[in-house]
Amino acid sequence: MSETYELKAETRDRVGKGSSRELRRNGLIPAVIYGDKQPPLSIALSTKDVTMKIHAGGFMTTVATIDVNGEKIRVLPKDYQLDPVRDFTMHVDFLRVSKGSQVSVQVPVHFENEEKSPGLKQGGALNIVRHEVELNVSADNIPESLTVDLTGLKIGDTVHISNVKLPAGATPVIADRDFTVATITGRTQEAEPTEEAEGGEEEA
């Protein structure tokens, strides 16, 4: 599980596009805390602090504490919006979580020991079907990533979710099938020379 962190925030009395634009001009990001059978809470956070956490990695899989005017609230980031042109954070949604809460989280998949895969050594390719897997997991036990060991995999082999070690108590959101995470595909055949190219060689 990623190390938790704390952000300071203040409540927002006004909502809407005009209010949000004003916050951004002042170096703040509008955000909402929702869930846990409580009414949504509109807040504003430091743009600099949130951007640093997003760029540090693991933002969507790390439970954080938000200090809202002295009240400590445990949350899990559920979504954030980026400006498509200027690439800065425009808004964040946080899910309120309590001790032992079950949450659904998209967890990134990492692959290791590629050099120990006979299929890859023979020129095969790693075809990643799922870069992330959505898990139902305790908010206190969210993994930073899932690891797939490629040792011994040959061309034609498939990695299913059942082959991936999950944290204790975690289950895939997709529960009705043993879905594919990755495959080792065969070597790409070189394109055959065209008739035009062959004819050119004969003339030469």
Curated annotation (Swiss-Prot):
NAD recorded as keyword: no
Family, as annotated: Belongs to the bacterial ribosomal protein bL25 family. CTC subfamily.
GO molecular function per UniProt: 5S rRNA binding; structural constituent of ribosome
Pfam short name (any one): Ribosomal_TL5_C
GO cellular component: cytosolic large ribosomal subunit
Protein name: Large ribosomal subunit protein bL25
Lineage top rank: taxon: Bacteria
Assigned keywords, A-Z: Ribonucleoprotein, Ribosomal protein, RNA-binding, rRNA-binding
InterPro entries: Rbsml_bL25/Gln-tRNA_synth_N, Ribosomal_bL25/Gln-tRNA_synth, Ribosomal_bL25_b-dom, Ribosomal_bL25_C, Ribosomal_bL25_long, Ribosomal_L25_dom, Ribosomal_uL5_bac-type
Organism: Rhizobium meliloti (strain 1021) (Ensifer meliloti)
Gene Ontology biological-process annotations: translation
Region of interest called Disordered, as start-end residue ranges on this chain: 1-20
Assembly with partners or alone: Part of the 50S ribosomal subunit; part of the 5S rRNA/L5/L18/L25 subcomplex. Contacts the 5S rRNA. Binds to the 5S rRNA independently of L5 and L18.
Role according to the record: This is one of the proteins that binds to the 5S RNA in the ribosome where it forms part of the central protuberance.
Keyword set includes Hydrolase: no
